[in-house]
Each structure stands twice: as structure tokens, then as C-alpha cells.
Amino acid sequence: MNPLILLLITLTVILGTLIVMMSSHWLMIWMGFEMNMLAVIPLLMKQYNPRSMEAATKYFLTQATASMLLMLAIIINLMYSGQWTFTKFMDPTASIIMTLALMMKLGLAPFHFWVPEVTQGISLTSGLILLTWQKLAPLSILYTITPVINPDLLLMASMLSIAIGGWGGLNQTQLRKILAYSSIAHMGWMMSVLAFNPTMTLLNLFMYILMTSTTFMLFMVASTTTTLSLSLTWNKTPLITTSILIMMLSLGGLPPLAGFLPKWMIIQELTKSNNIILATLMAITALLNLFFYIRLTYATSLTMFPTTNNMKIKWQFKTTKQMNYLPPLIIMSTLTLPLAPAMILLN
């Protein structure tokens, strides 16, 4: 792709998200979503092949359907309130339809089916954009309309997302699909606490973007997309492989790594709100995610022979990329659990 066109498309994606986050007019918000969606599709098809074409088509159809639902909710709310801007009161029907549309854009269960398929069909760079940046705009609207959202709908979707994010990743061998199911589960954790403490959702979002971005960048350095290729990188880049495995354990929420911090604080918040049964179910279901991450770590690090047969190693040129920002990202993604007391005081 021409660098100038790539820059223009990237700026349009950023501009679309910023319009959504900074607008108080529903029509401008809808236009921002459309700008963002139409600009991100060429980024998904940057590697021009049938898989990326299929992934981009699935993404377009899903997002277009969500945009239609969003416009329907905006029109119903306009008929109810008579104005285009945010109000303290929203028609209950419009609120439910808008929540469902934003859940579809985020990939929350039961509208999650497109996330693993689209993530698997695109490159690692496009997958990074899809699972991090593309979550900001819908989450900002959900954060804004939190007072008028039905909390039962959010809690049902969050519990279902955490369960599906755990079950779906159990039998996967593709690392991109594993991260996609992890994304579904993390979105569920964010939605569970949104109705009780929206600030906690922002903390979880920050930690999720930090850990997912670092993991994707490590995959790019190691040029690995499957569990088999990951297990064969020990001889080539042992430090990078170790970092990937630690990052995955952090994504799974294993203490004392940083991924445990948002889960700990969300469970604490739900317990304060007398949702003890929900907090218990979420903690138990989160073990599914942790299980397949630990299983992947065990299979990669403890069951391989010290020296792999050279015939099994893929040919690869030495990377010339300068990844000077990776060490601080890895440290922030794994060793920030001691910040928990400060977070509790701020909360």
C-alpha cells in the first residue's frame, strides 16, 4: 500500500474515533462510527488475499448491521425526547437497542461470532488495531449512557462473554484466535462493573490494551501465529518466547502478574455491590482462560526437547526492527500489581 494512502487511512480511523468520543450530538456520533468503519476496512485488507477479503467482508456486514441498529435507537430516542443531544433520560426501548448495537460493535456475547473469524483472517498489525483501538469508540458511548442502561442486560452479556471467552479458547491452536477469545472475556469483565463503577471499566480497558498490544508486538518480533511455531522459537529467540509466555499468563490473570489487578478490583467492587453470586461465577469462569494459557505455557516450555530437530525449524531472516519500546511495555504489563493499594485509595 502507498505510504501516503496508508497515512491518510490511519488518520481517518483516528479522526472517526475522536469524533465519536468528543461529540454530544447523536448524528455526529453515528458519522464518526461510519468514518471509522469505512477507513479501517482497507487496513484489514492490507495483506491482499482471500482470507483477509473474507474477514473484511464479515467485519463490514457486522458493523453495518450495528450501525443500522444504532441509527434506529437514535431515531426512537429523537421521537421520545425531541432532541439530538445526550439527555439524562432516554426511551427504554432506544436504550436497549443502542446497548445491543454497541455490544455488537464490541464483539460481546451473543454477538461475538465475528471476532475470532475476522482476527484470524487478518495480519498481526491489523489484529492489534481491531482488538485495541476499535474498542475505544463504542466503550466511550457506553460509558456516557451508563445511567440509562439496563444493568441486568449488561450483567447477562458480561457473564455470557466471560464464559464463551473461556470455553472458546480451550481448543484453539491459532494464537490470534486465542487473543480474540481473550478479548471477548475481557470485554465481559469491563461490562460487569460498568453499571456499578464506570471508572473501574477504564482501569480494566487500560490494562487490557496494554497487555494485548505488548503480546501482539511480541508475536510480530517472533513472527509466530500458531502454538507450534511458538514452541519452535525457543532455539531462535528464547528471551522473546519467555516474554510471550509471561504476557499470556498476565492476560489470563495469574497473580502476581499485572493482569490480576483489574480482576481483583472488579470482584471487590461487585462484592461491595452485593453481587456475590455473580462475582463468584465470574471468578470460577475466569479459570477457563487461565487454564488454556497455563496449558499453552506448559506445552511450550516444559514438554519440548532442549534441542529441536533442525528440519522442523522454519527459515527466517534476522529481524531488523528496533523494538526499544518493548521492554518498558513488558514491565508495565506484568509488574504493576503493587499499584493496587494506590488504585484502591483513588477509588
UniProtKB/Swiss-Prot annotation:
Its main location: mitochondrion. It catalyses: a ubiquinone + NADH + 5 H(+)(in) = a ubiquinol + NAD(+) + 4 H(+)(out). GO terms for molecular function: NADH dehydrogenase (ubiquinone) activity. Its EC number is 7.1.1.2. Core subunit of respiratory chain NADH dehydrogenase (Complex I) which is composed of 45 different subunits. Interacts with TMEM242. Core subunit of the mitochondrial membrane respiratory chain NADH dehydrogenase (Complex I) which catalyzes electron transfer from NADH through the respiratory chain, using ubiquinone as an electron acceptor. Essential for the catalytic activity and assembly of complex I. PANTHER family: NADH-UBIQUINONE OXIDOREDUCTASE CHAIN 2. This is NADH-ubiquinone oxidoreductase chain 2. It comes from Peropteryx kappleri (Greater dog-like bat). The gene is MT-ND2.
